[in-house]
Amino acid sequence: MKLAQDMNVDEIFLKQAAEAIAVISSSPTHTDPIIRELLHRIRQSSPLSAVIPAPENVLKAGEPENMARGLIRIPETQTKRTGGNNHSKEGAQLYSCAKCQLKFSRSSDLRRHEKVHSLVLPHICSNCGKGFARKDALKRHSNTLTCQRNRKKLSEGSDVDVDELIKDAIKNGTGLL
């Protein structure tokens, strides 16, 4: 195993990402199948397999010894895009997005997702002018390095006052970026 001082930035990032995924995956609550798949792909494709820990302690949903812990297996029809039908194996209805064909097990998830396709971006960052369809995405973006870089690009790119541009964007409901 390599020591931290012998690894480059990419190796350190991959190691930290794999460790974070392993920690999340080892929680006794429901493990997201996407997280399991990402960890599997990292282990398969990375030349750093010696750096990335194997999850001997990762609990697998649906296995008999883990059923007592409350872990359940989600049918593949609910975790992947499905073919023609809108029902999972258990008969639960899946809700399809008309624009991109993603399927959701709850109608509320579909309604939330559909905002991504909206042309009007009602949530505008007051610092850099970037528009978002959802308020939670704006909150995640606020005060990030990306936000600071966006503002810097706006101020360097024109002689117009950045704050005036942002006010217009908020009033019109269209992001600057």
Swiss-Prot record:
It holds the Pfam family zf-C2H2. The keyword Acyltransferase does not apply. Keywords: Cytoplasm, DNA-binding, Metal-binding, Nucleus, Transcription, Transcription regulation, Zinc, Zinc-finger. InterPro entries: Znf_C2H2_sf, Znf_C2H2_type. PROSITE patterns: ZINC_FINGER_C2H2_1 (PS00028), ZINC_FINGER_C2H2_2 (PS50157). GO terms for molecular function: cis-regulatory region sequence-specific DNA binding; DNA-binding transcription factor activity, RNA polymerase II-specific; zinc ion binding. One of its GO terms (cellular component) is transcription regulator complex. It comes from the Eukaryota. The keyword Nucleus applies. Its main location: cytoplasm. GO terms for biological process: negative regulation of transcription by RNA polymerase II; positive regulation of transcription by RNA polymerase II; regulation of sulfur amino acid metabolic process; regulation of sulfur metabolic process; regulation of transcription by RNA polymerase II. A zinc finger (C2H2-type) spans 95-117. Auxiliary transcriptional regulator of sulfur amino acid metabolism. Involved in the transcriptional activation of MET28. Present with 521 molecules/cell in log phase SD medium. This is Transcriptional regulator MET31. It comes from Saccharomyces cerevisiae (strain ATCC 204508 / S288c).
